[in-house]
Amino acid sequence: HIDSQNYYEDTVSFSLAFAQFNSQDICIYRSDWNRLEAFNLTTNQLLTERYIAAYKTEPPKHYLDYFHGALYVSPNNDYILDDGWIWHPVASPKVWSLSQWIKHNPFESEDGSSVQTLCYRENWNAVMCWLDDQHVAIWNIELWDQEEFDLKPEPKNRSGIHLLSLAK
């Protein structure tokens, strides 16, 4: 039974993707608005077992203030692309390493060293895809003013297709 709970779950596509890891079939799914799991379909085992304390007055360690969206696995099964958003609301697609998540750090999808925010934009649920193992295309990205944390004013703001590389 897969359930993403009921906190603004209608604002994003249901987070679900399949990948291959060590020649085994993996299901990646959202178990809460800000939490993803990886489940081995071959061995029937949860691969990302972890505990995150409840939010009280301060966010606990590994707390993620991020709504997971549609998931896209890279062609070589090395990365996961997540079309999620943060409060403002602002779209904030991210990528992270599947092998880092499963082999080394069950908190990788929250705040691991491989997590990269690709851009900020006004709208989420955008069309995006992997072009190859290291490059992502995202349609309709408005130009973003990082200092103002808002869209750049017209006429400078041109939407279009943006090609983004994972190379650091």
Language model segments and positions:
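Structural motif
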Residues: W33-F39, H88-W96, D145-H162
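Short loop/turn segments immediately following beta-strands, especially the blade-tip
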Residues: N44, S97-F107
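Long, mid-chain structured domain cores
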Residues: H1-Y55
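Short beta-strand elements that form the blades of beta-propeller/WD-repeat-like
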Residues: H1, S23-S31, L36-E37, N77-W85, ...
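Structural signature of eukaryotic scaffold interfaces centered on beta-propeller domains
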Residues: Y7-S23, F67-D78, R121-D133
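Surface-exposed loop and turn segments in beta-propeller and other repeat-based domains
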Residues: I2-E9, R50-Y66, K103-E122
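Loop/turn-rich, solvent-exposed surfaces of beta-rich toroidal or solenoidal domains
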Residues: W124-K168
